[in-house]
Structure formats: C-alpha cells, structure tokens
C-alpha cells in the first residue's frame, strides 16, 4: 500500500509535552490518519552500550531485536493511557496510525506507546 502523508493532522506545541500531532478536521473512528515508512535499526544501534541517546526517545520495538523510527509524523504522536488513535505494523517497513474513536478538529491525536490502546504498561517518563 502507498504511504500517506496526512492532510488530516499537523504538528504543533502540546502543553507540557513539547510537540504533538493535532487534528486539522474532524476524524471519524476507523479512519487511517497516515501510513508511514519506518527506518529499521538493530537494537544495539539505538541503545548501544553507553548512555541513552536522543534517538532512543523516538524509537519503538520492531520485533525481538530491532527498533524502528517512524517517518512522517509517526514519531511525534504523544503517549496517552486513554488514546484516540492506535498504530500497527503494515508490512515489513510501514506503520499505520488510525483513529479508534471520533477525534474533533483541534484535538491532540495520541496513541498508547505499548501498542495496545487499553494497556497500562508503565513508561519511562511522566505522562502529562
């Protein structure tokens, strides 16, 4: 499937979170917000043996020994334990972000970094 750079969202400042992804229009539940390519890296290149790198803040698990960086807005969606969107792998090197409920224009689009929308797995930062 082709990659989609979304016209439904934009990146702007998110209160207490740095940047975030926000809806430019109402988005209906089930809508694919964007389909993006991912850059796949060996786990050791992201985390190495030294201190945590800035790159690690944007990477997510891609199988047992790999990490991925999502292109497009993919690495800019903020985490929420009550997300309005989800992400999932779409082929060997693509990621999809889709609405799991209706999202209002101007609302921040968030995902659960665990990959499961209802998961309560702890994250390594304070959730705003």
Language-model region placement:
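Conserved catalytic SET/PR domain of SAM-dependent protein methyltransferases, capturing the structural core
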Residues: 1-128
């Amino acid at each position: 499937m082709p990659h989609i750079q979304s016209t439904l969202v934009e990146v702007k400042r998110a209160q207490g979170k740095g940047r975030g992804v926000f809806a430019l229009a109402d988005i209906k539940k089930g809508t694919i917000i964007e389909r993006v390519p991912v850059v796949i890296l060996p786990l050791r290149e992201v985390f190495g043996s030294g201190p945590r790198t800035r790159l690690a803040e944007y990477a997510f698990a891609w199988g047992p020994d790999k990490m991925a960086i999502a292109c497009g807005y993919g690495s800019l969606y903020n985490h929420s334990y009550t997300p309005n969107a989800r992400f999932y792998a779409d082929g060997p090197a693509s990621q999809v972000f889709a609405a799991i409920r209706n999202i209002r224009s101007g609302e921040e689009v968030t995902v659960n970094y665990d990959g499961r929308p209802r998961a309560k797995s702890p994250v390594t930062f304070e959730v705003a």
